[in-house]
Amino acid sequence: MGEKWRNEGKGSPAHGLSPRLQRAESALIIFAKAPIPGQVKTRLCPPLTPDEAASLHGSFVLDALERSQEAGRHGSVTVERFLACAPPADHVFFKIMEERHKVRLLRQTGDDLGVRMDQACKEVFALGYQRALLVGTDVPSLPASYYGQAISLLADHDLVLGPSLDGGYYLIGLKRPIPDLFRGIPWSTDQVFPLTRTKAEALGLKTALLPTCRDVDTLDDLLALVNEKGLSARSANALRLLASRLQSRTRT
């Protein structure tokens, strides 16, 4: 997987951000890691090989980028998309995504996920955006309409959350930086969503919820996704191939 991306392009890492698009009111920040074998989807290895997990992750990133294009067609609201890059931020994969999908690159900075999310919010609000949506890439079947729903809900709410079945959340939307929402959260546990709700209540935030979705972290999640509607043809084919390989391995 890594070799494939290295052969397709080259470029320098993202540096300072230029001013926002003149008409853009909302920033959609997609948090993603480079598809490096052994560094992504590690909870799926085994039974997947590191290369298989990296390939699947790359497909999910592409899905998120393609679906997020629909957010820019949400009525009169203009959305600018950012790809928040995890180390190495200068990986050629991200430069290719920037060129092909017309997203702006944003470095993830901070010691834990909460700090990185808070910093990303601060950066886009400092550029003048009125709303910020942060999403991951673990829900490849996420309907594109959810981005528009989140933006609409922020008109009358301080916070929008998209809960996931495992106790986390796949989307968070804000109208201003709220650092306390990201502090003291045990990331990658089933307490992420409930603790965030508790913090929001303590801060007096009016919160709206999107429908609950399943993200893909474990083998059970992966197998459940095989028959799920709404996947891109690319990810559907990749999942069917992986399921077939897993069945063959269990028979040997």
Regions found by a protein language model. Give the residues of each.
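Short phosphate-binding loop-to-helix
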Residues: 93-131, 189-192
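Short aromatic-hydrophobic micro-motifs that form the base-stacking/packing surface
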Residues: 133-135
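Conserved alpha/beta core of the MobA/IspD/sugar-nucleotide pyrophosphorylase nucleotidyltransferase superfamily
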Residues: 198-252
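A short, N-terminal amphipathic alpha-helix
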Residues: 57-76
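Short, glycine-/small-residue-rich phosphate/pyrophosphate-handling segment
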Residues: 179-199
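Conserved donor-nucleotide/metal-binding helix-loop-beta segment in metal-dependent transferases, i.e.
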Residues: 142-166
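N-terminal nucleotide-binding beta1-loop-alpha1 segment
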Residues: 17-43
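Acidic donor-binding segment of Leloir-type glycosyltransferases
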Residues: 72-103
